[in-house]
């Protein structure tokens, strides 16, 4: 291969340069060999020549002269002189070739020189290139974030090492320029401390081996919205990587692998019984399965006779989350029938970021163990934002304490806000005004209607258990309300079956508004009438039926208010009734009481009234 005598490579993280083992160009872009005004010959991307070399131009002399142009592939495998001797020494010990040009399409033409440095120990793209070209693995940063003794910068923390590396390169005449770039960089989500990319040995689950099964199983799931299942999560599975399941921590589920201190033989222990058998000690079956206790259990290697110890890693907590469906029942050791009856789950719900979290861990483990999806229906939730649409953060001071919100507005009001505000998968701007508005429109109206009934039922000593709702004797208003009631129950039932949450909430709200603002207002004189004539009894029974039935339909959404209504209207009068509204069946639709023609006519009348009221205020 032809050596490169002078190339201009760019790098953002200077502390990685001592670990450099290759350069990388984009195979699809054009590169040039140029003679620059400073007397040096450079290789770099054609699109970036003016950006990088333009400042070398003089009044009577251009910044550079193009000697050759060629595709990026022409540079592949060309060798260059290592920046640091320590990297060459490390590569030689591994008997691997390095310090040549590689190709990958991740290299961009937005900044730098179009030639990037490669250090496989520091970054996913670099690691991928390293695997593709079987590059040496050089890692001159320790776990404390300090450069190691092999480098000229031993003991210096990585962030402080950047200027030292630049000084060293400049002193050796190998630094062309050190411009500042603004770029995205990972920070700790809790304290905003900059992180460092760092490769370390891990245990993996080879998910790539079951990629097709993962995609097939995901296609059986009803995702709401479908765009998440087919798009975000589907794309994640299309590009699935092997899952690094080990963590170097003290806490967590210990990785159940024992390794021989002599020959390296490894065994995966499948349970307490097997552990006791291998240890030759019945007490091992009772050991606390966490560190440090589990680490004390050792046994003899069958290959060389030396001692086998548990490896020090623990398991990623997301692996625990994916094991939830069977681990909660101690399956497969017991409760086999219970598990099989309840798996897969009919429905789960979590936030959109769980496409890489719980949704993934459940799907991965279910596919690996049972080759089927672990859930049938998924509602994906959008994130809760502040009233300005910003992500809530304690550090920014815009986070809402959920306990304060519950204290101020009540659980039902907050639940109702999320149901009625927007589709579940869209972000929600949470603020008090929106909660109280929903509380007023629906919950306040329902409660006022209930209070109206209770007030006059107590005055008249009306007991609904002593009367029967006789449909043939009902007025048009009564029949209309019952028709609206069971049309609403039917709509709510169908919407919930299809996971249409806002539609369900709006159907309930619409009915409650009609019941309060039209039925009760038009029928007040009937409740005020003297005695207990048939018409008055019909009004009471109609309103009672509507209140109890709509409360049962709304109970999953506003459990506390509906429970309060049920306790007073039902349990207080009927000792044989279920002790809670949440132990009742969902209301059954009485199709024979649904009169769509009557509903249409009443809707037209309501529209006329609304228009008439509007004209009054003109």
Name what the model sees in each region.
Residues 1, 7-20, 32, 74-81, ...:
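Residue patterns forming the tRNA-binding/recognition surfaces of aminoacyl-tRNA synthetases
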Residues 133-144, 249-251, 274-427:
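Alpha-helical recognition segments enriched in aromatics with Gly/Pro capping
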Residues 61-65, 69-106, 193-194, 198-216, ...:
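Conserved oxyanion/phosphate-binding beta-strand-loop segments in alpha/beta enzyme cores
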Residues 7-26, 188-190, 249-250, 254-255, ...:
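Conserved phosphate/anionic-ligand binding catalytic regions in large, soluble enzymes, centered on
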Residues 18-23, 29-115, 124:
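Protease-associated
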Residues 90, 131-140, 167-177, 248, ...:
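Secondary-structure transition/capping motifs at alpha-helix termini
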Residues 94-107, 139-141, 211-218, 325-342, ...:
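Active-site-adjacent bridging/hinge elements
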Residues 460-490, 521-611:
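Acidic, turn-prone loop/beta-hairpin segments
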């Amino acid at each position: 291969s032809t050596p490169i005598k002078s190339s201009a490579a760019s790098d953002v993280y200077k502390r990685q340069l001592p670990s450099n083992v290759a350069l990388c160009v984009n195979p699809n872009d054009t590169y040039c060999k140029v003679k620059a005004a400073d007397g040096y010959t450079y290789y770099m991307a054609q699109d970036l020549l003016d950006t990088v070399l333009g400042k070398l131009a003089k009044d009577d002399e251009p910044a550079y002269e193009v000697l050759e142009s060629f595709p990026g592939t022409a540079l592949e495998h060309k060798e260059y002189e290592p920046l640091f001797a320590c990297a060459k020494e490390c590569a030689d010990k591994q008997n691997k070739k390095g310090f040549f040009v590689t190709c990958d399409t991740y290299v961009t033409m937005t900044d730098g020189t179009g030639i990037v440095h490669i250090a496989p120990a520091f970054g996913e793209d670099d690691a991928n290139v390293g695997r593709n070209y079987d590059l040496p693995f050089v890692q001159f940063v320790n776990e404390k974030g300090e450069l190691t003794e092999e480098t000229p910068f031993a003991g210096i923390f990585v962030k402080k090492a950047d200027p030292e590396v630049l000084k060293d390169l400049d002193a050796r005449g190998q630094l062309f320029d050190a411009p500042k770039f603004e770029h995205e960089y990972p920070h700790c989500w809790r304290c905003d401390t900059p992180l460092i990319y760092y490769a370390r040995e891990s245990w993996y689950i080879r998910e790539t081996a079951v990629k097709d099964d993962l995609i097939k199983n995901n296609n059986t799931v009803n995702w709401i919205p479908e765009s998440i299942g087919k798009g975000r999560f589907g794309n994640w599975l299309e590009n699935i990587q092997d899952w690094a399941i080990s963590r170097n921590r003290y806490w967590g589920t210990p990785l159940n692998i024992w390794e021989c201190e002599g020959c390296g033989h490894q065994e995966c222990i499948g349970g307490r019984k097997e552990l006791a058998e291998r240890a030759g000690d019945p007490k091992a079956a009772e050991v606390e399965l966490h560190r440090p206790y589990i680490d004390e259990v050792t046994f003899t290697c069958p290959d060389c006779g030396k001692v086998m110890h548990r490896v020090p890693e623990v398991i990623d907590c997301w692996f625990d989350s994916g094991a939830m469906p069977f681990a909660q029942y101690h399956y497969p050791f017991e409760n086999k029938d219970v598990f099989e009856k309840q798996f897969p789950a009919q429905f789960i719900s979590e936030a959109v970021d769980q496409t890489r979290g719980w949704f993934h861990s459940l799907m991965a483990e279910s596919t690996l163990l049972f080759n089927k999806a672990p859930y049938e229906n998924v509602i994906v939730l959008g994130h809760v934002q502040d009233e300005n649409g910003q992500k809530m953060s304690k550090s920014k001071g815009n986070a809402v304490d959920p306990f304060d919100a519950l204290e101020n507005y009540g659980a039902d009001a907050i639940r109702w806000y999320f149901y009625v505000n927007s589709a579940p998968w869209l972000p929600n701007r949470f603020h008090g005004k929106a909660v109280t508005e929903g509380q007023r429109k629906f919950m306040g109206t329902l409660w006022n209607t209930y209070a109206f009934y209770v007030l006059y039922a107590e005055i008249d000593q009306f007991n609904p258990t002593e009367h029967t709702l006789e449909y043939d004797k009902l007025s048009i208003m009564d029949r209309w309300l019952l028709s609206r009631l069971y049309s609403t129950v039917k709509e709510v039932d169908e919407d919930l079956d299809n996971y249409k949450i806002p539609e369900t909430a709006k159907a309930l709200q619409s009915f409650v508004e009609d019941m309060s603002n039209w039925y009760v207002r038009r029928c007040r004189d009937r409740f005020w009438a003297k005695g207990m004539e048939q018409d008055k009894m019909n009004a009471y029974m109609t309103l009672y039926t509507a209140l109890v039935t709509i409360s049962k339909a709304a109970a999953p959404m506003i459990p506390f208010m509906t429970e309060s209504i049920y306790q007073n209207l039902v349990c207080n009068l009927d000792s044989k009734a279920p002790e809670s509204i949440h132990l009742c069946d969902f209301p059954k639709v009485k199709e024979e009481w649904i009169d769509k023609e009557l509903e249409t006519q009443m809707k037209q009348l309501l529209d006329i009234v609304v228009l008439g009221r509007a004209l009054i205020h003109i």
